[in-house]
């Protein structure tokens, strides 16, 4: 961009895709987006779930459109499943039987994990017993298809990783500095419109199962608005959830990406010259 090349910022954050979550997802402001096209920010209504496959299909279209007009698409975000689906493709898992899905999601988490340990022990060993989303997904696939999720994941198709020139960069800030920023961010959101954002979501009476209703900050603020949590308790809970997510992202970025992807560790500032050298610009 400094050299005058047109660019397009493509969102790769699973919360920033929702129009309903401008504040709680820390979506870039109009001022921050001025002058450079930003796409897939606030592109989905909260009533419609944006799956990794949905996002990857939209991202492929935006990347192709950018290339067609000679612009550089820059993916920004830390949702690992989105990025891996775009690059590697998607597993052709058959449609899950709705009754199976309903039964699995109605199970106590402990019971679901115990069943997964018996039916797909390899997958169960890789998951934390509290990882409700991944446990229920693995179990519903096993029940509905008769095969473990790993079987389907070995048959990925549709990825663009081999068709584009990648210049990846992983930013790894000092962990305690990052956690302090997480805590501060949630407090600023609380006073900067997050309450009104959640009130508007609750007024829509959307199902709790939708991703927009499970986004960090929404359950905590909803509990405060219902009178189930005090202000301080809701803020502390939201801060803890944010730190937990940052920790999971940190682990994923360190261990799940190709080893040759450059990583930049820093304390509280970013050296743009070093970034340029890492990206081989």
Curated annotation (Swiss-Prot):
Gene3D superfamilies: 1.10.20.140, P-loop containing nucleotide triphosphate hydrolases. Residues 13-16, 133-137 are annotated as: Interaction with substrate tRNA. Belongs to the IPP transferase family. Catalyzes the transfer of a dimethylallyl group onto the adenine at position 37 in tRNAs that read codons beginning with uridine, leading to the formation of N6-(dimethylallyl)adenosine (i(6)A). GO terms for molecular function: ATP binding; tRNA dimethylallyltransferase activity. SUPFAM superfamilies: P-loop containing nucleoside triphosphate hydrolases. This is tRNA dimethylallyltransferase. PANTHER family: TRNA DIMETHYLALLYLTRANSFERASE (PTHR11088:SF60). Its cofactor is Mg(2+). The record marks 79, 101 as: Interaction with substrate tRNA. One of its GO terms (biological process) is tRNA modification. It comes from the Bacteria. Disulfide bonds: none annotated. Its EC number is 2.5.1.75. Monomer. It catalyses: adenosine(37) in tRNA + dimethylallyl diphosphate = N(6)-dimethylallyladenosine(37) in tRNA + diphosphate. It is an enzyme of class 2 (transferase).
């Amino acid at each position: 961009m400094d050299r005058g090349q047109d660019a397009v910022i493509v969102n790769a954050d699973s919360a920033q895709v929702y129009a309903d979550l401008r504040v709680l997802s820390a979506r870039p402001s109009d001022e921050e987006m001025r002058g450079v096209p930003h796409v897939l920010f606030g592109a989905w209504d909260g009533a419609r779930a944006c799956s990794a496959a949905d996002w990857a299909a939209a991202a492929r279209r935006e990347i192709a459109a950018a290339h067609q007009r000679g612009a550089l698409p820059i993916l920004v975000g830390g949702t690992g499943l989105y990025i891996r689906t775009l690059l590697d493709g998607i597993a052709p898992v058959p449609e899950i039987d709705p009754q199976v899905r309903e039964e699995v999601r109605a199970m106590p988490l402990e019971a679901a994990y115990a069943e997964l340990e018996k039916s797909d022990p390899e997958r169960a060993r890789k998951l934390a017993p509290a990882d409700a989303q991944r446990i229920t997904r693995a179990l519903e696939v096993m029940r509905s298809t008769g095969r473990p999720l790993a079987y389907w994941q070995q048959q990925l198709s549709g990825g663009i990783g081999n068709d584009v020139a990648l210049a990846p960069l992983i930013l790894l800030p000092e962990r305690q500095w990052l956690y302090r920023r997480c805590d501060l961010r949630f407090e600023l959101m609380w006073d900067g419109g997050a309450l009104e954002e959640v009130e508007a979501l609750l007024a829509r009476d959307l199902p709790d199962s939708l991703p927009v209703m499970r986004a960090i900050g929404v359950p905590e603020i909803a509990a405060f608005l219902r009178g189930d949590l005090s202000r301080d308790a809701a803020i502390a809970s939201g801060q803890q959830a944010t730190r937990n997510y940052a920790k999971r992202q940190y682990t994923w970025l360190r261990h799940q990406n190709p080893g040759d992807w450059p990583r930049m560790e820093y304390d509280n500032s970013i050296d743009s010259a070093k970034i340029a050298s890492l990206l081989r610009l």
